[in-house]
Amino acid sequence: DGPYFIENKPAKVKGKGNIVNYIKGRINQPILIVKPNSGCDTKTIFSLLDYSNLSHPNMYKIEKAFEKNDFDTLANHVDNSLTDSAIKVNLDILDTINRLRACGFEIVNMTGSGSTVFAISNRKLPYKLYKKVLNKDNYEIIKIVNQI
């Protein structure tokens, strides 16, 4: 997840993060980034991954959503195959996801192998509510990035 935060562009990342293909287009909503105080060990997360039951997001639909600035399609297809494994190791991730969904964010997911979570909404209200449901003492980072 580092390359697209550095470049501020959406990207499809493969391999060990070393193959970066930027996606054309943008989604014009701000992105809330939340990092719990606790973390995850990437090696452990991958060791818990159930490869027989692995789902992958439809990257074609995600790329088209960015190209067309189609928030609803993006919301229906964003996924992270590592989330279930990471939650087994770190329940703070699930708590953060649940709190952000309760605020009304349509897209809530984990970045990379965790424990950072991102949230995006097509409405303004969730961006006002999150401050009430996230205790700053439990998080290293709570930041809004303008858009991707």
Language model: regions and residue ranges:
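Conserved, helical-rich catalytic subdomain that frames metal- and/or nucleotide-binding sites
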Residues: 5-7, 12-107, 124-148
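Conserved AMP-binding
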Residues: 1
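Glycine-rich beta-strand-to-loop/alpha-helix junction loops that act as flexible
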Residues: 110-115
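Short, amphipathic C-terminal "tail helix"
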Residues: 116-121
